[in-house]
Amino acid sequence: MILPRLAVVVCAMLLASFTPPAAAWNRSPAVRFATLPAGTAHPEGITVDARHFYVANFDVSGETSVGNIVVFDRRSGRWLRTLQITHGSSLLLGIAFNPVTGDLLVCDLGGQQVLKVDPQTGASSVFAPIPGGNGGPNALAFDAEGNVYISDSFQATIWRAPPGGGIPVAWVTDPLLGTAGIPPFGANGLAFNGHASALFVANTGNDTVVRIPLPDGPAGMPGTPEVFVNSINGADGLAIDSADNLWIAANQADEIVVVNPSGRVIAKLGDFDGIDRQGAPVGLLFPASPVLVDGFVYVTNLALDLRGFGLPQAVDSQWTAEVTRHTIARISARIPPLRGLQ
């Protein structure tokens, strides 16, 4: 009996010698909320009003030659209508309502412009043409006066346009807003914190979130940009909650990363779990843009194959190539407790 008892003692000592991990992420699952109709693909930007979600398509697959904004019921996720944006390209990105004017604006990457769109008919007009000749308008944010801030992924710039539109001015240009990385998009998602004392900018190719301090608010001169947090794999769209936590779509990690105002990660939500028999991603696949509403975070599954841009394959490229049905996912916006020491 000595050997069995000795084995038990040795096993107990070995187990006691291991230090438990500091934390393990209790990932809330991402479930399908809505499915894009036939003829539309690659949902990127997302916004919401009292009754509807509006989803802008970045259609690099050639499904259509015009830009599409797909409208879903806010409660059920049922498809209601598709707005065809005939005065723009098929490469639509960030979309948002100006909270001051009520205008629906969308970034048209292919047209190097921001469009104003009628949310009922899809009729559009140019709101802000992007200067410089190589514009990459990607995401939108607004200050309390209704001024519009536009991230430019290709010119390392945040532009500012007045509430009624017009040619924007370069508000901030900085190397931290550009990239030589993959995916080849620099400045991307935008979000002001609650007191408008800083503007946060996701840099997708650099895997960073950049903080632009605003010591006198948006009306004053912006401070020097600084890296707020790095190693967010493919930092894309941003949302910010009432506690000033940043919700970041990590498009190369297939997850939503939540960081608190100090930059400490407090949650990693969602994951990718393959392609279902209908050709739709299960969970998150190249998530692009989050929006927080009704106790959930809604996320567009862009499912973009980077090889279509002549780039080397990413780890999810072969999966994205299999997607034939494009989706919007939903995750509980409750921050789950950590499993482990805190």
Which stretches of residues belong to each language-model region?
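Bacterial N-terminal signal peptides
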Residues: 8-17
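A short beta-strand motif characteristic of beta-propeller blades
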Residues: 29-37, 78-85, 123-130, 169-181, ...
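Beta-rich, blade/repeat-based domains predominating
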Residues: 39-52, 65-66, 86-103, 130-149, ...
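Residue position within the beta-strands of beta-propeller blades
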Residues: 54-57, 106, 150-151, 201, ...
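Short glycine/acidic-enriched loop and turn motifs that connect beta-strands
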Residues: 59-64, 111-112, 155-157, 206-208, ...
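A short loop-to-beta-strand structural motif that recurs across blades of beta-propeller domains
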Residues: 67-70, 113-115, 157-160, 208-210, ...
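Short loop/turn segments that connect beta-strands within beta-propeller blades
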Residues: 73-77, 118-122, 162-166, 213-218, ...
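Blade-level signature of beta-propeller repeat domains, shared across WD40, Kelch, NHL, RCC1
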Residues: 289-342
